[in-house]
Amino acid sequence: MACIVEDPQRAGQSNETQIALISGVPDDISKSCLARVPREYHMAMKCVSRRWRDFVCSDEMCDYRNEFNLAESWIYALCRDISGGVFLHMLNPFSSRRSWKRINDYPYIPMREGMGFAVLGKRLFVLGGCGWLEDATDEIYCYDAAMNTWFDVVPPLSTKRCYFACETLDGKIIAIGGLGLNPNAKRTWDIYDPLTRTCKSCSDVNIVPEMEDSFVMDGRIYIRGGVGGSSTAVYSASSGIWERMDDDMASGWRGPAVVVAGDLYVLDQTFGAKLTMWCKDTRMWIHIGKLSQLVMKQPCRLVSIGNSIFVIGKDCSTVVIDVENVRKNKMNGVMVCSSIPKTWDDDIDVISCKSVAI
């Protein structure tokens, strides 16, 4: 994947490139060896030398690990504390001591709300937003998970917006609807292409107002909004148009949604928390089970890794659901799941969650 942000200039890099990654070993073999090191050790590897650091942080390293199924997905939660400050928490689900950790402070928009959150490759993007004393903005910021660094991204969104849906499709970031200085913003969407560094705006009357939730499945973007989330629409990149969502499918979309192995799961938080699945063959919603309220606090966000759904609630209280085994392991209708407790006393709201594979 091509570089999509401006990296800081590194002094003396030309001299370092003449030094082998591993003494006496060709660089292609050295890169193959380094790419096989588990992700939890990458931070230590960056301390060995500048060349090791540059390779570990590179798109080449990320692409190699993805190509040979070596990539490991970590979860990143965009959070807000009681003071209104915005920051990131990270979870390594493969660690023997699974716990959330706060990472680099978010330096640009400490009090902003209604932001979009998206991931492309090894980079997370925070888009738009507004504040009590700040109008909707078109700014885009990028966090490189390999470099552990924030960057300012250009160009900005075509439309200043907040409280909008944000998804990635075909290698592009799509910001949909929401509110903005332009009253027509709620009927528009922006397509940001990181390869060409261009952002174009499109409009369609079928885009639903007051955006609440969205997901991507089978090459389409689904959005839900309106009063009580009663309006839905679906976008196909091949046609470039928005259409009304199927009524049967829309009827069961009553909470945050996530796609696992091509199947759609929804966490209905109307009365407690219950997990449902959309069956494509019968075109019906199937009740999977309930979640215990003792290990998590609503409202919750969902993110998937492999066959597992991570239900992330207030204060980053987390429940892990294995969708292959959950139907067999239930007690009185309550799903048997593993949990990851919070490790701090602060009051934290989770805005959005994404996984980044490196």
From Swiss-Prot:
It comes from Arabidopsis thaliana (Mouse-ear cress). Kelch repeats lie at residues 78-122, 123-171, 173-219, 220-269, 271-307, 308-355. CDD domains: F-box_AtAFR-like. This is F-box/kelch-repeat protein SKIP4. The lineage of its organism: Eukaryota, Viridiplantae, Streptophyta, Embryophyta, Tracheophyta. InterPro entries: F-box-like_dom_sf (IPR036047), F-box_dom (IPR001810), Kelch-typ_b-propeller (IPR015915), Kelch_1 (IPR006652). It comes from the Eukaryota. Coiled coil: none annotated. The keyword Glycoprotein does not apply. Pfam families: F-box, Kelch_1.
